[in-house]
Regions:
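Structural beta-alpha unit
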Residues: 80-117
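A short acidic, glycine-rich active-site loop
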Residues: 54-75
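Short glycine/serine/threonine/alanine-rich loop segments
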Residues: 29-30, 90, 143
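Absolute protein N-terminus
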Residues: 1-2, 149
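Small/aliphatic-rich secondary-structure junction motif
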Residues: 2-61
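Generic structural signal for helix capping and beta-alpha/helix-loop junctions
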Residues: 40-41, 102-104, 126
Length: 149
């Protein structure tokens, strides 16, 4: 069994990763914790901030701050999850890539021979795009997708 865990920096994806690690331990499975930093989404969030705050002069600075904060959050989560995996002597790895979220996830899925995908029920920007990632990948993924809250 090989598990692909989608991590986006949200508490939901972190909880999903913890559960995936427990599944991997019980099933003696290999685990890949995978994260995509999508610059288009950080730009979109910065533009949303610009519109709401009437501070479009700061849009570039805000985009960089969102990017740095997201990268830091994902890095911290990956460090904790990797420590847990190491303590349990699990086979696994992690990867962070930049690109279009859906494309990168599908590319990793197709290259990895995965038998299960695990993700959180809500993403980092759950108030804006609830459930969109599942809708975008579910038609292209031919294995079970476990969605955790």
């Amino acid at each position: 069994m090989k598990i692909l865990v989608l991590l986006d920096g949200s508490k939901w994806s972190y909880k999903a990763a913890i559960n995936a690690i427990e599944i991997a331990q019980r099933k003696d499975a290999e685990i890949m914790i995978f994260s995509v930093i999508d610059r288009a989404e950080t730009r979109s969030a910065a533009f949303y901030f610009c519109q709401q705050s009437n501070r479009c002069d700061l849009v570039n600075e805000h985009e960089e701050k969102i990017y740095r904060d997201l990268k830091k959050s994902i890095g911290e989560d990956l460090n904790e999850l990797t420590l847990n995996m190491n303590r349990m002597n699990l086979k696994g790895s992690s990867k962070v890539v930049e690109g279009r979220r859906e494309e990168e996830i599908l590319k990793e899925f197709k290259s990895g021979d995965y038998t299960l995908v695990v993700m959180g029920a809500f993403g980092k920007r759950s108030n804006i795009r609830v459930g969109t990632l599942f809708n975008e990948i579910s038609t292209s993924v031919n294995v079970p997708i476990l969605i955790l809250r």
